[in-house]
Regions:
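Short, flexible, glycine/charge-rich loop motifs used to bind or transfer phosphoryl groups or to couple energy/partner
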Residues: 1-2, 20-21, 111, 128
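Single conserved hydrophobic/aromatic residue that forms the stacking wall/gate
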Residues: 1-9, 13
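Alpha-helix termination/capping residues and helix-transition junctions
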Residues: 5, 24, 112-115
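A structure-centric signal for secondary-structure junctions around beta-strands
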Residues: 6-8, 27, 78
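Extended, compositionally biased flexible segments
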Residues: 10, 14-31, 40-43
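Catalytic-pocket segment enriched in acidic/His residues
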Residues: 39-153
Length: 153
């Protein structure tokens, strides 16, 4: 899954219950990221009635590109977002069409987690999520943030 990522600023330190209207003041910057899922582990844990975080939290599950300061990135909240697998489009949309805005995501998460400077938050993803296998190459990007290329080994 392609995602835009945001990085908490110093203003985030120990903040909880952040209002949507104030949420973007807590963002230091943005990056391109891939939010990977091991469906085999996820389903195995789910079938066993266990928490399935192992399907999301495995080695190299969240590659991320270079960080860009929020002040240096214009129009990120309407930017194009896309992912190709082996040169074929799999996901293509813009961030403004995602279910939750960046500000809504921060506000929601701050109800349950103490957000701190340096925290990485992977946002939502457009439709088109699908499997990848060894040897596949994923190239994704967010307009204004560049691209990220990952080969599955």
């Amino acid at each position: 899954e392609i995602a835009s990522c945001l990085v908490g600023s110093e203003m985030c330190i120990r903040d909880r219950n952040i209002a949507v209207e104030a949420a973007l003041q807590h963002v230091w910057g943005y990056a391109v990221g891939l939010d990977m899922t091991r469906r085999d582990l996820q389903m195995k844990m789910r079938e066993a009635g266990r928490p399935w975080e192992l399907g999301k939290a495995f080695d190299q599950s969240a590659p991320i590109g270079p960080l860009h300061r929020a002040a240096d990135v214009a129009g990120i909240h309407q930017a194009g977002i896309w992912l190709q697998v082996n040169g074929k489009d799999k996901q293509r949309s813009d961030i403004g069409k995602l279910i939750w805005s960046v500000a809504e995501t921060i506000a929601y998460l701050s109800r349950y987690f103490r957000l701190e400077a340096g925290d990485l938050i992977y946002t939502g993803t457009p439709e088109g999520v699908g499997p990848v296998v060894r040897g596949d190459t994923m190239v994704g990007g967010v307009e204004g943030l560049g691209t990220l290329s990952v080969r599955i080994d």
